[in-house]
Every structure is written in structure tokens, then in C-alpha cells.
Amino acid sequence: FFGLFIYGFLLRFLMQAMRAPFRNPAGNAVIALTDWAVKPLRRVIPGAGGYDWASLVAAYVAEIAWIVSMLLIFSSGFAGFSAGAALFVLASAAVQLFKAVLWLAIVVVILQAVLSWVAPDGPLSALLNALTFPFLRPLRRVIPPIGGTLDLTPLILIVVLQLVLMVPVRWLEAAVMALLR
């Protein structure tokens, strides 16, 4: 339940940051899923620099709510709310949000690669291209297509994102867990 909203808020933030088109089924779904939280937050947290900060804050608050609910369910509740516990929740939410962005990027790259073969002119193509282009462009400058048509940059990007998930993100998770000691 929380994950759906977290990914919805993140997708909305990324779509606006990368100027992706919203006039498609996925864009309409993201707006329908997130408007209830983002619109009121925009009154307090306006967009700046081309970024919809309200969407990112909504994702962060949803991540905090998820972590607190899991702590309440799977532990005997908060033994005592301390500054250390608050710092753990805030840091853990930031790391989990970063992890969610990486997983979202992996899924979007896979969808874009599959749809480029199956339905290159489909209604989601422009959206997926807008979301993946900023990540694939630097790789495409260095790695040309094989035989002129086979682009391996999505695969390379997925491997790089997986490596980021395996090394720095795990280190960050361990550092956050150390806050509990």
C-alpha cells in the first residue's frame, strides 16, 4: 500500500523533473494517484528550479510513515522515542527513498527497452524515452550500437544501477543500522 504511493510520488517528481509528457495513460494514473497529497503540499512547498518538491516531500513522508508503521508492528512499539530513534527513521527513509529511485530507474529502463522492440510508437514510448534519455545519453556517447542497430546501453545502465544497489546503498543501510546501537 505505502509502496504504491511512494513510487507514484517518485514517478511524478521524476516525470516533472525530466519534462516527461503527462498526457498518456501512465501520466493520468500518476496524477490520479498522487493529487490528493501533492496539491495541498504545493501550498506549503512550492516548486522551484523546475522540480516539484511537494512530490518528493510526499514520497519522503510516505516512506517515514512506512518505516514507523513497520517498527510499531514488528517490534514491541517504541520503547521510548529518542533523538537516536528519530534520526534512524529519518536517515532510513532517505536511504530507502534513494533505493526506490534506483529500482524505479531499473524498471523504467527495462520497460523502455521491451517497448522499443514491441511497440516503439506506443502511447508510453514518449514517457519512457523522456525518463531514460538523461541516464542513457552519457553512455550512448561512449558506447555505439553494435552493428548500427543493437543498443546495449540500457543493459549497461541496469548493471551500473545494480552495482550501486549492491555496494554504496548497502553501505548506507549498514550506516543507518549503526544508528540503532
What is the meaning of each model-derived region?
Residues 1-181:
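Selective transmembrane helix interface/packing segments
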